[in-house]
Each structure stands twice: as structure tokens, then as C-alpha cells.
């Protein structure tokens, strides 16, 4: 499965911190740096595909 799909599935499950997401991606076989992951998550927020909560956790936007 591709990284983007796995990340989308993770974000759809619940709210996670970037560190928690990195760990879940590692369990799925993906090695991503925390810095690049955080940058990508912030890009998803900017594009309107994800939400960043006040506590620093990320999730997908509800449809």
C-alpha cells in the first residue's frame, strides 16, 4: 500500500501527534523522519485535507 493511503487511514482513525503517527507508519513498514512528516501534515492542513487541533494532534476533516 502506498504511504499516502496509509497516512490517510491513520488520520481517519483518530487524532494523533506527529510522533504517534510516525510510530504507526513505522509499524506499517515506513521510515519517515519526524521533521518531514510534520511538514507534510502542516501542508495537508494548509490544503484543507487535515485538521490540526489545539493540542498539536492531527486528524482528517469530517465530510
Per-region residue spans from a language model:
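Short beta-strand "wing" residues that participate in macromolecule-binding interfaces
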Residues: 52
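Short, positively charged loop/turn segments that connect secondary-structure elements
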Residues: 26-40
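Positively charged, polyanion-binding regions of nucleic-acid-associated proteins
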Residues: 1-15, 36, 41-49
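A short, structure-level motif marking secondary-structure boundaries and short turns
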Residues: 6-7, 24-27
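Short acidic, hydrophobic short linear motifs in intrinsically disordered regions
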Residues: 16-25
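Short, cationic-aromatic polyanion-contact patches
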Residues: 55-63
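Short Asp/Glu-rich motifs
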Residues: 30, 44, 63
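Proline- and acidic/polar-enriched loop/turn elements at helix boundaries
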Residues: 23, 37, 56-57
Amino acid at each position: 500500500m502506498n504511504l499516502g493511503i496509509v497516512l490517510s487511514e491513520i488520520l481517519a482513525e483518530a487524532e494523533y501527534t506527529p510522533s504517534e503517527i510516525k510510530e504507526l507508519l513505522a509499524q506499517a513498514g515506513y521510515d519517515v523522519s519526524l521533521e518531514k512528516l510534520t511538514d507534510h501534515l502542516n501542508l495537508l492542513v494548509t490544503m484543507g485535507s487535515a485538521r490540526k487541533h489545539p493540542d498539536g494532534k492531527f486528524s482528517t476533516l469530517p465530510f
